[in-house]
Amino acid sequence: MPHLRGDALAALSRSAYRGRLMPEVTKDQVADTLEEIAMMLELKGENPFKIRAYRNATRGIETFAGNLRQSAEAGTLGDIEGIGEAIAQKIATLVTTGTLESHTNLKAEFPPGIFDMFDISGMGPKKIHAVWKELSITDIAELEKGCRDGRVAGMKGFGEKTAANILKGIEDRKKHAGRFRMGEIAADAERMLDDLRSHPEVLRVAACGSYRRRRETCGDLDFLVSTREPKIVSKDFIAHEFVESVIAHGDTKSSVRWLSGIQADLRVVKDAEFPFAMNYFTGSKEHNIVMRQRALARGWTLNEYRLGPVDAPKTKPEPVPEIREEADLYRALGLDYIEPELRENMGEFKAAEEHTLPKLIEVENLRGTFHNHTTLSDGRSTLREMADAAIELGLQYLGIADHSKSSVQAHGLDEKALLAQVKEIRALNKELGPDFRIFAGSEVDIHKDGSLDFDDEILAQLDYVVTSVHSVFNLGEAEMTERIIKAIGNRHVTMLGHLTGRLLLQREPYAVDHAAVIEAAAATGTIIELNANPRRLDMDWRWWPLAKSKGVKCAINPDAHHTSQIQFLKFGVGTARKGWLTRDDVVNTQPLGKIEAVLAAKTQRGKKA
């Protein structure tokens, strides 16, 4: 089944694997279950009115501000907008028992492989139903065969172009097989780190590899511990509740498969070896090569266990300094300490030699954030809930940017609804007081020709504007680039959202000339978003050094559709650090008293021009 809400469903699945129910079924889990039922009914070709009833119920649950269990016990679930008596009874069963038999039975009617087809870009319920019923295709392998032998192209409503796009989606899925997004693994990785830290026999612990370097996806997880009792620690690692199966087990290395599907490795070393192992297993490979070369230049040999003199009769190595911490190793090699996120051999050694490494941004530097959605479009939390969550996180401001009218699939707001929301925001700001502010904005669609979804008269009434591409992804690079540059040329556009439209491990970025867009952003004073949603992390970290050199500012935005997703900011900070960004490069490190001027700067410049 597709991950409709990623982390929430993944957490639910892990709990089920462990053979215990969630202590309380959440609103998101109920909404996910109802949406799954709607999708399965659509797969079966059921009555559209029945499907719509479940979709309406999903929407009703998403916007419901009360307690579902209390409503179930009081018999008032039917009072929620969009929920009829029959579905109310199903919801009551789900929230009180943790299971819904009709959902389980319905899922059992389908071949297991059919749900994997949802992972293919462009394959929705209608197309999956068509290939299933007309061609008896029940999994991705059969779908690929059907595309290659012409059967899929020959179906009504498909054609050669659709078949080619499906094949591309299948190839993309193969390419990404075995990779995991940060949002899928971070919670479990941090939990494992906490559990290892609390182990009585563990002296030091670290996560290494691409996770520590904050790459956008990971193939596996690498944990490192130092201990005097390797047998005990290794045995406890493979017995952890996350473990589905043991791949290999030994005193110095153990590999397991977690219930989430990712492989996790534990390496066990002596405490004196820890800084060397930590550096080596963090990588990257290219970074490690340079580290070893620098050691050899001093007459030393460096590996994952030690730094020592080269064993050669004619060499006169420098005295080997004592290394207790990873920073000591860099110092010994004539370098300032290089943060893990920068270890890609992309300029960090030169900067470390010249003492010009940046002081990278920290999560604690953020004072607020923009590009957040509410239940007025496709969000699952109300305006007030989003504001309360931001306040609880210690933020000073929150920018709301619900979808604009062309995003019909996301319940985009028209002019009337948008201005009503602005009025609501102004009123809520008065209620919340002077120490916190909600900024009224909109995520405005960029049309194919580069025009915007709202005219300037509407945009001028907003505090800020995010503009994004949400349709027609298949343009050539030149046309897509021209489209985006035209859009950000509007003086009311404050920031450009998710530059490439990519969905990590799911949808490839559309073709766009990053350098040209960055130049245009610099020329117009447009902020570029670093979309912190772990499915996006867009603009990619590789382009931020160029943007920074051109004076383009970054806004780290969570693209939150729920209160819990505001915390996606931490993933954005990881990517920003990987892009060499400091607090001065990111606009939402500015306090409330200064951010208004930042948001208004482009518009004011446009007035003077």
What residue ranges belong to the model's regions?
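Two-metal-ion RNase H-like nuclease active-site motif
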Residues: 207-210, 368-372, 443
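Short, Lys/Arg-enriched N-terminal segments with co-localized hydrophobic residues
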Residues: 7-21
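Accessory alpha-helical DNA-binding modules that contact the DNA backbone or grooves
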Residues: 23-24, 38, 48-254, 275-276, ...
